[in-house]
UniProtKB/Swiss-Prot annotation:
The keyword Heme does not apply. The active site is at E50, D61. CDD domains: Tryptophan_synthase_alpha. Keywords: Amino-acid biosynthesis, Aromatic amino acid biosynthesis, Lyase, Tryptophan biosynthesis. One of its GO terms (molecular function) is tryptophan synthase activity. HAMAP family: Trp_synth_alpha (MF_00131). PROSITE patterns: TRP_SYNTHASE_ALPHA. Its EC number is 4.2.1.20. Pathway: Amino-acid biosynthesis; L-tryptophan biosynthesis; L-tryptophan from chorismate: step 5/5. It comes from the Bacteria. GO terms for cellular component: cytosol. This is Tryptophan synthase alpha chain. Pfam families: Trp_syntA.
Length: 279
């Protein structure tokens, strides 16, 4: 783990609560608004930030995140600007871990070595690249780890006992358990199935296990956080941005505050998760 990531999970373990991991799309709907959102996330209770890298062909994302990426690209967002977003955030916040999430194509075009160097300079702690399987670890995963950047893998309900060790082999930071098959923004999974899956993964790794896909409300966060080391929320936040925009997709005076209000509620749910689990 990077020092920031390691420290954050150690703090959360001492507090006896799961992490709230919040995803937003870099550059949605514009650079300045997304920077405002990024700064507001930890103030509202987010423990770890997932910074989305917009891409024109996001095959694993549902309609909400696809639209967010389109808005960002339309507004001129690039991978370089997404790295700059993190660097600007770091000017006022050096404590909150940042994980960049997206697809390999923009990184490949940017140049892997240059991307990793620039990511380090920007204060990036980890990467989630959804279309790079373990068989392609030499492409980005191994170089990232050598630079001191975590490479976070996804496990799913179909990741069986034979496949799981391969998925976890070079994983660092935390494991992201995708709680259901399909695209982002799906319905809430069965909590008992999630609990069993987290236990199964923990038999193979000492890393924290964070659960995402389908978490939209404080109550969802409370339930899922009862068994997971972290709760990941993405689509609900992206939807909150979208509903605050003008009819032509421009930010309003309410955009940042709307996201902050949602995240405060999610934080309350996450922080009460272990109390519920202990009852």
């Amino acid at each position: 783990m990077t020092a920031r990531m390691d420290k954050r999970f150690a703090e959360l373990k001492a507090e006896g609560r799961p992490a709230l991991v919040t995803y937003f799309m870099g550059g949605d709907p514009d650079y300045d608004t997304s920077l405002g959102i990024m700064k507001a996330l930890p103030e509202a209770g987010s423990d770890i930030i997932e910074l989305g890298m917009p891409f024109s062909d996001p095959m694993a994302d549902g309609p909400a995140i696809q639209l967010a990426g389109q808005r960002a690209l339309k507004g001129g967002q690039t991978l370089k600007k997404t790295l700059q977003l993190a660097a600007d955030f770091r000017k006022t916040n050096d404590a909150t871990p940042i994980v960049m999430m997206g697809y390999y194509n923009p990184i490949y075009i940017y140049g892997v070595e240059k991307f990793l160097d620039d990511a380090l300079l920007a204060g990036i702690d980890g990467l989630i690249v959804v279309d790079l399987p373990p068989e392609m670890d030499d492409e980005l995963c191994i170089p990232a780890i050598r630079k001191g950047i975590n490479f976070i893998r996804l496990a799913t309900p179909t990741t069986d006992e034979k496949r799981l060790p391969k998925v976890l082999k070079n994983t660092s930071g935390f494991v992201y358990y995708v709680s259901m098959n399909g695209i982002t923004g799906s319905a809430l999974p069965d909590p008992s199935l999630v609990s069993g899956a987290v236990e199964r993964i923990k038999q193979h790794t000492k890393l924290p296990v964070c659960v995402g896909f389908g978490v939209k409300t404080a109550e969802h966060a409370k339930v899922i956080g009862g068994s997971a080391d972290g709760v990941v929320v993405g689509t609900a936040i992206v939807n909150q941005v979208a509903t605050s925009l003008t009819h032509d997709g421009k930010a309003t005076a309410d955009t940042v505050q709307a996201v902050a209000t949602l995240v405060r509620g999610l934080s309350t749910g996450t922080r009460s998760a272990r109390l519920v689990a202990a009852e």
